[in-house]
Structure formats: C-alpha cells, structure tokens
Amino acid sequence: MKNKENEVLNLTLNLTIIFLIFCNISIXIFKIDFTKHKAFTISKVTKNLFSSANETIYITYYNSGSLENYFAFPNQIKNFLISFSDASKCKVIYKEIDADKISTPLEHIGIPSQQIDLRDINQLSILKIYSGIEIIYEGKREVIPVVTEISNLEYDLANGLDKLINNTKKVLGLAFGDSTLKEAHKNFSEIMKKAFGIEIKEIDLKTEKLEDIRKDINGLFIIGAKEIDEEIAKKIDDFIVNDGKIFVATSTIDYNPQNPYGITPIKSSLFDLFESYGIKYNDNIILDKRAPTIFLGGNFQTYYPWILIDKSNIVKKDMPLLKNFYTATIPWSSSLELIKKDETEVKFLPLFASSKQSWQVKEPNLSNISLNAFEVPNKFEENKTKILGYAIEGKIKSPYKDQYSKNSKIILTGSSMIFSDYMYNGSPSNFELSGRISDYLMQKEEFFNIKSREVRAKLKFASSSNEMVNAKFSLIIVNLIILPTIILIFGLVRFTRKRKAN
C-alpha cells in the first residue's frame, strides 16, 4: 500500500514538473496568448489573407528609438507585429528600423513626423518622433502613417493587405441633399481617405443617374434632405431596391450653427420615402441633460443640443456596428420613430438614443433653441429615451413600383452635422463611427469583426500594463519558487526511498 502511495506521489510530482516546464516553453515556442482579451491573437480573416498571398509580404515598422524611454506602446506594437509575422507561416517578413538613425526623411514614403508634448510626464520638452508602418507586396505599397496603439492595428494591416493582395477598392459615393451643407463638410473626404483608406466620389443627385454609378461605389452617403424632391427620391429608392447600401445623415430642421436663430422646418420627399419603408423623421430637435461640456464663448458649458452617445445609450449592444464602440456626439438631431413592426424579411434595428433626461423642441419654439441651449427644464415631458438612429436590413418594398430588394442595408440618423467639420474639432470619435458605417455598407463584416473585438491597448507612458506586470510576477513565482520547491520535494522523496531501500 505504501509503495502504491509513493508511486502516485512520484507520478504527480513528475507530471507537475513537466506541466510547469511546458508553461515556460509554450510562451516562447507555441506563442500561447495569455492576455485577457487575446491582444496578440491574429484573427481568421487575416490568416485567410495570408493564405491568399502568392508572394512574400514585407512589413517594416519605423519608430524613433527614443520613444521607448517615455512610452510603452512601441514595444506593444513590436510584440504584436512579431505575433502577426509568426501567424503568417513565413508569408510575412517583419523588420523594424530606428527612425532616429536614418538620414532620409520618412515623409517621402508617407510617414509624417509627430510632436509629443512631454510636459505631461515632467519633461520640459517636445519630442519629434516617427511611428508608422510600411507594407510591401509584389512591388505595391500601403502605409499606415501613424501608429500609437494596437487596438485597431490588425484592422489597419488587414485592410492594407486586402488592397494589395485582392486589389480591393473602397469607394463611397457622397451626395448632398442640401448643397449649403458642403461648406460644413469640406474635410470629410480627406478624413475618410487618411483614416480609413476610403476614396470618396462626389455625386450630383440632380444630374447623375445612380444606376450608372452603382458598380463604381460600395455604398452611398447622403447628407441633408432639403433639396430632395420626388424625382430624386425615386432615384434613391431605385438604388436601394437594387441592393444599394445607403447611409443618411439629415435632420427635419434646417439648422446652421453660424446662423442659430434662422431655424426652419424642412419638407422633403426623402422623409416620405423612409416613412414608406417604416421609419418616420419627427419634426423636432432633441436636447439632453446628459450632454457633453464644450468650450464656447470663452467658457466651458454643457451644450444640450449635442447628445453624448456611449455604451449606456446604445440600444443594440450586440450589433457588430456598435460593438465595443466608445463615444460619439450627435449634434442638433431630430428623433426617429418606428411606424411599422418587424416583418419576416425586414428588420428595424434601433441604434442609439438620448438619455431619459432629454426633451424635444418643436414649432413654434424652435427659434428659442439657441436661447435655451444651456438651460434644463424643471421637468421632462416623458421619462423615456428618444431614438436618434435606425438600421433597416432585408427585403425592402419600393413605394413607386412593384419591386423588392434582395438584401438592402440602410442606416438613418437624425443629424445632418454628425460628420461635419464642427464635429471633427468637437468630437473626433464621430469619425470612428463613419469608418464603422462604411465597413457595414461595404459588407466587409469579416474585417469589421476585427475592429469589434475588445480593445487591445491604450496609449500609455512607459509603465507596463497590469497584465504585463501580473504575467511577469507569475513567471517569477513559477520559476523561482514553485518549480524549485517541487523539484526539491521530488529529490527528497527519491533520496528517502533509496535510503530506506538500502
């Protein structure tokens, strides 16, 4: 019986030692990702791109070596790119170059210098740095000009590889249903190209036929509705029922921030079209007590016509479009109302809403919005939220002819200023939403799911993350305490057994 107990103990100690040694080896050889959200695990989408590549992919990370003295992100990026290369099964050759040690300016390949203010970490200086990635495949080049975190790095790399390997073109049509809004969106095309690699093709709804350009664009953005008559509405309907993908940013109120007292309601055939589909645009502007604070008139003030959208007021939290989305600000928005029920072949998906402490302003009080934009009413009309965005998916029936779409995608928002230049300064995260909407319309869901994963990292000063500290501490405990202790016990047991045997 005693011999049997000794054998069991001996086997247990052997297996424990083997397991602990395996844990150490697996980190270096098998590249097992122990981070909470699998920060360094490459998705199936990217691996499929590797399989499609017929030639070697060259990825170079240019970064200033001095960065590592102040920030943690260069090492995070390097570790991620090493994991990226390992996952490619020799399809990717990765190298890093210290930008401080090369004489040729990186601007010539599209990687600009950045200035980082070090006063936040008690350094009285401003550091000029580079941190960008170059991808080369079959002599073609894609560049990620600025990289300071790994949260969206796989998405950016996969997009670049998709363009190089599959010759994918990302082109969005941009049409203004109100020509006066062009001035407020002068930078939109440039932002979309720089941030998401999306080409913008501007379309004149009055003169151009959408059926002629349907094959040239992946989706259509329409901003404003004031000048859309029934003839143009029919063009838009024809685009939709022929499976065109569309995003609409418009309000029922003609509001210009430069002329805040000249507020008038808008009548448009575009509203009639969407009402026939099942969504009504209400004649109001929504104000919300839970609005962001902005710098206006020399002071920081809570500006109630700007509605803060975050996890708390995202309605469809499981929808990939808004999964793991942070924040956006919806300015001067009308509310949207569902007037049809979900049907078997059509889904109506509410996206985001105001808070319960919100209120609406209608005629004849619209001109008072600017006067009362910083005042909260004593009581709210209703203790419920107002929907500010809807998605429609499925087979949509045209109100003008007997035709159904096969699989339409429409996103409607109640603000014509959501992606305006005002918001680029006031709420830059709005343009993260524009990129997500673009992917959604382009039916690049597989790429979109990369971006919908839990955030991998944030820009940090040169202090290791909690996960990294915990991992190092665990390895110290295993290697310096647990493993030696078990080996010592194993040796003592063997020694004791031999002495007794003798």
Curated annotation (Swiss-Prot):
Locate the transmembrane regions by residue number.
10-30, 473-493
Q: Does the keyword Transmembrane apply?
A: yes
Domain of life of the organism encoding this protein: Bacteria
Grouped into one coarse class, the protein's main location is: membrane
Membrane topology per the entry is: Multi-pass membrane protein
Keyword S-adenosyl-L-methionine appears in the UniProt entry: no
Protein known as? Uncharacterized protein BB_0752
From which source organism is this entry?
Borreliella burgdorferi (strain ATCC 35210 / DSM 4680 / CIP 102532 / B31)
